[in-house]
A protein has these predicted regions:
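Histidine/acidic-residue-rich catalytic or RNA/ligand-binding cores of hydrolases
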Residues: 94-98, 128, 236-245, 258-264, ...
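His/Asp/Glu-enriched, well-ordered alpha-helical/loop segment
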Residues: 315-400
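Bacterial Sec-dependent N-terminal signal peptides
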Residues: 1-23
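Divalent-metal coordination cores built from histidine and acidic residues
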Residues: 74, 78-88, 100-229, 245-246, ...
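Conserved beta-strand scaffold positions in the cores of enzyme catalytic domains, especially
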Residues: 28, 69-73, 145-147, 414, ...
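C-terminal cap of metal-dependent C-N hydrolases
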Residues: 32, 371, 375, 391-428
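Histidine-rich, glycine-flanked metal-binding segment
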Residues: 25-27, 34, 38-80
Length: 429
C-alpha cells in the first residue's frame, strides 16, 4: 500500500495556473464525509474505492490495499456527486461567440468548479459530437457532454440561432435540428437524430399535442428520451407531460397551462409580492400530474433572474418563475438544476437561487444539481449519486455545503470518470 501526497500525484504546469488530470487504475479516497441524495446528513469517515472510473466499494475506515493503489487521504473533507448542469448551450454559433477557443475555456472552468456533466439543449450537433468525444476520453478538460436533437415546427427555423447552428447545411433539415409536421416520417427523423449522436430529442416550438404524442411514442420505441420546452404554442405543458417527456424546461412557461396570453398588467406590476401572490393562478393539477409521471422540471431560474435585472419589462417572468418553482417544490415535483445562461455563471448560481428565492434547503439544491439533473438526462443509473456501480464523478469540498449553499464553491479537487483534476495557484515569479 502506497500513500501518495496529492501534490506529487497531480501536476501539469500551465502559464497562469497549474492544472492536472490523473487516472490511476485503482484510486482510494479515505476519511471523507459523504453527502448525496442517499445521505442527507454527512456520513463520516468513509473510504471510497474507485476502479477503472467506477465506484466499486464504499466502507467505513481504512483497510489494506494493493501496492498499486493510489490513496488520497482527504482528512474529513466533504464528498458530493459531480454537479450536473441540465441546461447549457455550448454550440449555438460555433463560427462566432461559441468558437472553439472560448468554448474550451468555459468547459475547463466548469469542470474545475465541480461540474462533471452538462446537457446541451440545442446547438450545432456536428460540433457537439466532437466536443463530447474529446471530453469522454479526456482529450479536453471538460464535463461530459450530452446533447439534444431539436425538433420544432417549420416556422421556428427563421430564428437566426438555428441558422448559425446549421451553417453550411439546411436549416430545419439537419439530423440534429429538424422541422417536423404531421406529414414527417417521425420514425426516420428520430433514427437520424440518434445517428447524430444526440442523447435526447428536444421539442421546441409550434408543435401540436398530437404531434408531440407521435414523437414521444416513437422515441420510446427507439429508446431515446424526449425533453420538452414547457410550452410549444400548440401543445400545453400538461400535453407534454401526458405524452411522456421526461423533463420540461422553464418554470414561467408552466403558466400557459392556465392561460393563452400573459395579462398586460403583469408586465407593469414590478416585484411587489402582494400582486404576484394574489394573481398567480394555481397550477396544482399540473403539479399533481408531473409528480405522478415523475416529470422533472428544469426551472432555469438564473436566466430569468438576469433578464429581470437588465429589463424591467421582464420582471414578471422572474416573479412567476420563482413562485412556480417554489410551489412545484412544495408539491413534490422533481426539480433539476439548469442555467440556460450565457456561460458567465454556472450551475452553482442556479443552486443558490433555488435556496434563496424558491425555498429549497441546501440539501435539496444539491439533489437538484446531482440526482435530479442526472434523471433529467436519463443518466440516473450511472451518475448523480455516490454508490457502488456509479461513475466516479465526485467533488471534494473543504466546507460543509449543508451549512451554507455557497460552500458548494469550496472545491478542493474534482474527479470525473476516475480522473483526478485539481487547480493549483501559480507560484509568483
Amino acid at each position: 500500500m502506497k500513500l501518495h501526497p496529492l501534490c506529487l500525484l497531480l501536476f501539469v504546469a500551465l502559464p497562469l495556473f497549474s492544472a492536472a488530470q490523473y487516472r490511476p487504475h485503482l484510486l482510494v479516497l479515505t476519511d471523507v464525509n459523504i453527502i448525496d441524495a442517499g445521505h442527507p446528513a454527512p456520513t463520516a469517515h468513509q473510504t471510497i474505492i474507485i476502479k477503472e472510473g467506477r465506484i466499486v466499494k464504499i466502507q467505513s475506515g481504512i483497510t489494506t490495499f494493493p501496492d498499486s493503489a493510489v490513496i488520497i487521504n482527504l482528512k474529513g473533507r466533504y464528498l458530493i456527486p459531480g454537479l450536473i448542469d441540465s441546461h447549457v448551450h455550448m454550440a449555438t454559433d460555433p463560427s462566432g461567440t461559441d468558437n472553439r477557443s472560448h468554448t474550451l475555456q468555459v468547459l475547463q472552468e466548469m469542470l474545475y468548479s465541480g461540474i462533471t456533466t452538462v446537457r446541451d439543449m440545442a446547438g450545432d450537433g456536428r460540433v457537439l459530437a466532437g466536443l463530447a468525444r474529446d471530453a469522454n476520453i479526456g482529450e479536453i478538460v471538460s464535463p461530459d457532454i450530452y446533447y439534444s436533437a431539436l425538433m420544432a415546427g417549420p416556422s421556428f427555423f427563421s430564428d437566426p440561432r438555428t441558422q448559425a447552428s446549421t451553417k453550411g447545411g439546411v436549416g430545419g433539415g439537419m439530423p440534429y435540428m429538424k422541422a417536423i409536421t404531421d406529414t414527417t416520417n417521425i420514425a426516420l427523423a428520430i433514427a437520424q437524430a440518434i445517428g447524430s449522436g444526440a442523447s435526447g430529442i428536444k421539442l421546441y416550438a409550434d408543435l401540436s399535442a398530437d404531434l408531440v404524442m407521435k414523437v414521444v411514442n416513437e422515441a420510446k420505441k427507439q429508446n431515446i428520451p424526449v425533453w420538452g420546452h414547457a410550452w410549444l404554442q400548440g401543445a400545453k405543458p400538461s400535453d407534454i407531460v401526458k405524452a411522456g417527456a421526461i423533463s420540461i424546461s422553464h418554470a414561467p412557461l408552466l403558466i400557459y397551462d392556465k392561460m393563452n396570453k400573459v395579462p398586460d398588467s403583469w408586465k407593469k406590476a414590478g416585484p411587489g409580492a402582494d400582486f404576484w401572490d394574489k394573481n398567480l393562478p394555481s397550477l396544482d393539477e399540473l403539479f399533481i400530474l408531473m409528480k405522478q409521471r415523475r416529470t422533472i422540471l428544469d426551472a432555469t431560474l438564473l436566466t430569468y433572474k438576469k433578464w429581470a435585472m437588465t429589463d424591467t419589462a421582464m420582471q414578471w417572468d422572474y416573479q412567476i418563475a420563482k413562485r412556480i418553482t417554489s410551489h412545484a417544490y412544495a408539491s413534490g415535483v422533481l426539480i433539476c438544476a439548469g442555467t440556460d445562461d450565457d456561460q458567465e455563471q454556472f450551475v452553482q448560481e442556479e443552486m443558490r437561487l433555488l435556496v434563496t428565492d424558491a425555498g429549497f434547503s441546501p440539501f435539496d439544491a444539491i439533489v437538484a444539481a446531482t440526482k435530479n439533473s442526472a434523471g433529467a438526462i436519463n443518466l440516473d443509473s450511472t451518475k448523480g449519486s455516490i454508490a457502488v456501480g456509479m461513475d466516479a464523478d465526485l467533488v471534494v469540498l473543504t466546507r460543509n455545503p449543508l451549512e451554507n449553499i455557497d460552500n458548494i464553491k469550496s472545491v478542493d479537487l474534482v474527479i470525473k470518470g476516475g480522473r483526478v483534476y485539481q487547480h493549483f495557484a501559480a507560484s509568483a515569479p
